[in-house]
């Protein structure tokens, strides 16, 4: 079978999505696909001066866009959502090429963008304020919400388009243009989204730079977060990144919305439905090759059902379809993003055994016929205790299994990590579920019952507590 020319495919997709050739070729930043490890594009990088120019253009656009009535801004977002529907498969293919996701996940990510546009269109007629009684006779208090200004958005490689849309759709209906720094590993999808939005805006009579893209490494990110022309910066990434971004924005009295790492756990009670648990746990742990901020990383299992649970999971792991999703639609687990991610996984597994844990299954490199890519066998690791390693987030498909005797002990283990994004419990009864969902249960921003912790649903506020940053997106916030 002839190998497809993925660089040519990427160029064709970008052209079809309206990206100017000068933005996606002829540059010095080499974009490799995790599917094969080959270069699929060479894009120009931005400089600090480019960031300054982009923020200046966004400020000028803000003066005009914020004067457009909210419902009319909502019409532009509605049209953008429709354009995404028209190009859903093309954009999803680009997500798969650039981020290595399987087709269903890529299509689901674009659908999240569409759903977010639908939510924001409704909000465009509801953004208002409050009228309150005053203690002074003949007066009333009015709280009125006004557009904030240009918004900076920093996104990660694992959700290269959806997280931007969570921010962009709401910012746009509120009157705020955006300056977007995608991960330098996945800038092509950003260029495509910005191009689609720009075309929609121009067709509606708004020749304004509503979503500019700046591409580059940490220096570009620093220039963005330190720019005083951005009253708000929304940043998605690691806890380490957030610890750098937050103080930089605060130093200039800006606002930051941080969506950072997770070390998500699920509790399996002694009378849980183990077949339901198996299905939920497997995808939560191995989906996106364990590269979601909501991926399941710790499984806290009652000692009475621990052996049976591990046996069921190990059997399922041994049957996982791992490989190149571009060539095989049946694949469930695609590649890690790059060699650095693979090295991090191997280092974590070596450290786990040094700390007394045992690898039940997986952990090795998988032969997918792509020697320059990094496919791995998802690992299950039994740990006698919640060691320092288990308290860290390793962005790879490693599931640590811990045992407990009493529910209070399980919840204590669950909460005894720095991060607090998503969580789950598998109980047959409401009492355990309510205990977990209550104020003395999970300390995460998201709690699930009888389903996995991975994923998000538009309309419900997404975000976490503690070292996850405290930000909320895509919902009632």
Q: Model regions: which residues?
A:
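Terminal low-complexity tails and localization/encapsulation signals of metabolic enzymes
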Residues: 1-43, 75, 79, 129-155, ...
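Rossmann-like NAD(P) dinucleotide-binding subdomain of oxidoreductase/dehydrogenase enzymes
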Residues: 129-276, 330, 404
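Conserved C-terminal structural/oligomerization subdomain of aldehyde/semialdehyde dehydrogenase
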Residues: 36-41, 205, 267, 368-477
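N-terminal Rossmann-like NAD(P)+-binding subdomain of aldehyde/semialdehyde dehydrogenases
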Residues: 1-139
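ALDH superfamily catalytic-core signature
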Residues: 199, 240-385, 412, 449
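Residue-level signal for inorganic ion chemistry
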Residues: 37, 73, 95, 117, ...
């Amino acid at each position: 079978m002839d190998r497809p020319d993925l660089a040519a495919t990427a160029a064709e997709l970008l052209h079809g999505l309206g990206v100017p050739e000068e933005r996606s070729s002829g540059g010095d930043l080499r974009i490799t696909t995790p599917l094969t490890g080959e270069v699929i594009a060479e894009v120009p990088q931005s400089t600090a001066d480019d960031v300054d120019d982009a923020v200046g253009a966004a400020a000028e656009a803000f003066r005009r866009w914020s004067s457009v009535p909210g419902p009319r801004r909502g019409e532009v977002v509605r049209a953008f959502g429709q354009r995404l529907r028209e190009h859903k498969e093309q954009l999803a293919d680009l997500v798969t090429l650039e981020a290595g996701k399987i087709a269903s996940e890529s299509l689901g990510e674009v659908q999240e963008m569409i759903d977010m546009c639908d939510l924001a269109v409704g909000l465009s007629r509801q953004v208002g304020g409050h009228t309150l009684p005053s203690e002074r006779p003949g007066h009333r208090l009015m709280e009125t919400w006004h557009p904030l200004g240009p918004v900076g958005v920093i996104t990660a490689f694992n959700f290269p388009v959806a997280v931007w849309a969570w921010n962009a759709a709401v910012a746009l209906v509120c009157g705020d243009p955006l300056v977007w720094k995608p991960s330098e590993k996945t800038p092509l999808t950003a260029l495509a989204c910005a191009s689609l939005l720009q075309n929609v805006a121009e067709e509606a009579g708004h020749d304004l730079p509503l979503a500019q893209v700046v591409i580059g490494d940490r220096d570009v990110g620093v220039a963005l977060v330190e720019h005083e022309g951005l009253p708000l910066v929304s940043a998605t990434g690691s806890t380490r990144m957030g610890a750098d971004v937050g103080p930089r924005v605060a130093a200039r009295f800006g606002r930051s919305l941080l969506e950072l790492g997770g070390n998500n756990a699920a509790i399996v009670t002694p009378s849980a439905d183990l077949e339901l648990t198996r299905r939920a746990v497997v995808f939560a742990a191995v989906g996106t090759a364990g590269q979601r901020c909501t991926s399941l990383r710790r499984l806290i299992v009652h000692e009475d059902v621990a052996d049976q649970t591990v046996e069921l999971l190990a059997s399922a792991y041994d049957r996982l379809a791992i490989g190149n999703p571009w060539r095989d639609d049946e694949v469930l687990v695609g590649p890690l993003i790059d060699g650095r991610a693979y090295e991090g996984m191997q280092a974590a597994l070596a450290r786990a055994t040094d700390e007394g844990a045992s690898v039940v299954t997986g952990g090795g490199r998988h032969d997918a016929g792509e020697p320059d890519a990094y496919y791995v066998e998802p690992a299950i690791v039994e740990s006698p205790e919640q060691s320092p390693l288990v308290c860290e987030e390793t962005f790879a498909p490693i599931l640590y299994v811990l045992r407990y005797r009493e529910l209070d002990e399980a919840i204590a283990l669950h909460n005894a990590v720095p991060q607090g994004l998503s969580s789950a419990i598998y109980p047959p009864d409401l009492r355990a579920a309510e205990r977990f969902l209550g104020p003395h249960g999970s300390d995460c921003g998201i709690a699930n019952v009888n389903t996995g912790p991975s994923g998000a649903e538009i309309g419900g506020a997404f975000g976490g507590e503690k070292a996850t940053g405290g930000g909320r997106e895509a919902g009632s916030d």
